[in-house]
Amino acid sequence: WNSVVLAYKFIDYLDQNPTLIPENIVVTVIPSLNPDGIYKIIGKVGRFTSLDVPSGKSTVPGRFNANEVDLNRNFDCKWQPKSKWRDSVVSAGQEAFSEPEAKALRDFILKDKPDAVLFWHSQSGAVYASECEKGILPETISIMNIFSRASGYRAITTFDAYETTGDAEGWLASIGIPTITVELTTHETIEWEKNLAGIKALFEYYK
């Protein structure tokens, strides 16, 4: 849930500081791709703060949507019906993009054609590149290193803790969109200053 709180904070910050965004850049912030999962944990619809999060409650159920599908295994990059998340086998849906949330992001991406995408997750305290079956895009390496230097997060080119299939980041890489994932250090903190520094560095790079 902390990555969602961070996204909302960025929305507020950019609304209050519009001149921070270079004139040639359009920024879209999607706070969460999984409202069902958020509702399982928070118990409310729409925006929330850290004060709304029940203490001591497991956040694992919030990983999955109402169909008990891991949405970050439902994209068209080496998709399989079953995938892994940590030590667990998880459902990746009936087929790639079987879930409405994954379809919504796919349709938005194909319509808007962003120059770059950044995901916020937690927790490992690092920024990761993305790849599918054709390797890492050179631009992805560039923005990963730029964000890493500005924020202080470790830069990691390949996630190798366990094999993943059907991830959104990999799908974006497969269609030629540079994508990085910033993993916050814990499941509670938003590390605002580090992430603000990283975003400012990306604005400077793309202006």
Segment roles from a protein language model:
Residues 26-28, 154, 178:
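Conserved beta-strand segments of alpha/beta enzyme cores
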Residues 116-119, 126-138, 159-207:
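Active-site-adjacent mobile loop/cap segments within catalytic or ligand-binding domains
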Residues 50-62, 148-157, 186-200:
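Short, surface-exposed, charge-dense and proline/glycine-enriched linear segments
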Residues 1-138, 145:
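Active-site/substrate-binding loop(s) of hydrolase catalytic cores
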Residues 141-160, 167:
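Short, flexible loop segments at boundaries between secondary-structure elements
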Residues 104, 108, 143-150, 201-205:
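Generic non-transmembrane alpha-helical segments
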